[in-house]
């Protein structure tokens, strides 16, 4: 399905990847990314978000947390990334990419909270009152206030 879309929209990318692989320049299981197209799409999304007043973030897990791709998307106008787990936050932060939203899929472990707070995310998703208390205590100890998003689920 995904490859069909790439074949229609960007056949040159596929041709280049095949040629590079067949010449032994890139090995199998290598990500081949069209950074120009990614930046073009990021600029279009950013322009629309500004027109509509909707805040946007991007998930670097979709391209294996590649810090070069993340930096290009930020350069194109996105404010920062959604870190779906602490490893993602650390990987992006290490390369200077802004981490704007944490805890989206996996809660940040309690002993990692102070380090992630140092990243100054705009928002932090919380799944439970216990995690809210852990975050609040850590933020207060650091003299900070952290905005949160609550993950709400229907009763099971």
Residues covered by each model-derived region:
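Short hydrophobic "helix-edge" motifs at membrane interfaces and signal-peptide entry regions
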Residues: 24-25, 50-52
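CE4/NodB-like, metal-dependent polysaccharide N-deacetylase domain
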Residues: 43-51
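Non-membrane alpha-helical structural segments and their capping/turn regions in soluble enzymes
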Residues: 32-35, 39, 67, 129
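N-terminal, Lys/Arg-enriched amphipathic/low-complexity engagement segments
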Residues: 27-28, 35-38, 45
């Amino acid at each position: 399905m995904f490859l069909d879309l790439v074949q229609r929209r960007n056949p040159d990318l596929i041709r280049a990847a095949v040629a590079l692989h067949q010449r032994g320049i890139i090995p199998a299981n290598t990500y081949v990314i069209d950074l120009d197209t990614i930046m073009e799409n990021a600029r279009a999304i950013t322009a629309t978000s500004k027109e509509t007043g909707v805040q946007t973030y991007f998930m670097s897990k979709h391209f294996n947390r590649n810090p070069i791709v993340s930096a290009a998307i930020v350069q194109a106008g996105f404010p920062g990334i959604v870190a779906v787990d602490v490893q993602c936050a650390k990987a992006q932060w290490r390369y200077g990419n802004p981490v704007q939203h944490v805890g989206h899929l996996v809660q940040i472990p309690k002993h990692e909270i102070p380090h992630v707070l140092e990243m100054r995310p705009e928002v932090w998703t919380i799944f439970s009152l216990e995690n809210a208390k852990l975050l609040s205590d850590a933020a207060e100890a650091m003299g900070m206030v952290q905005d949160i998003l609550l993950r709400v689920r229907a009763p099971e």
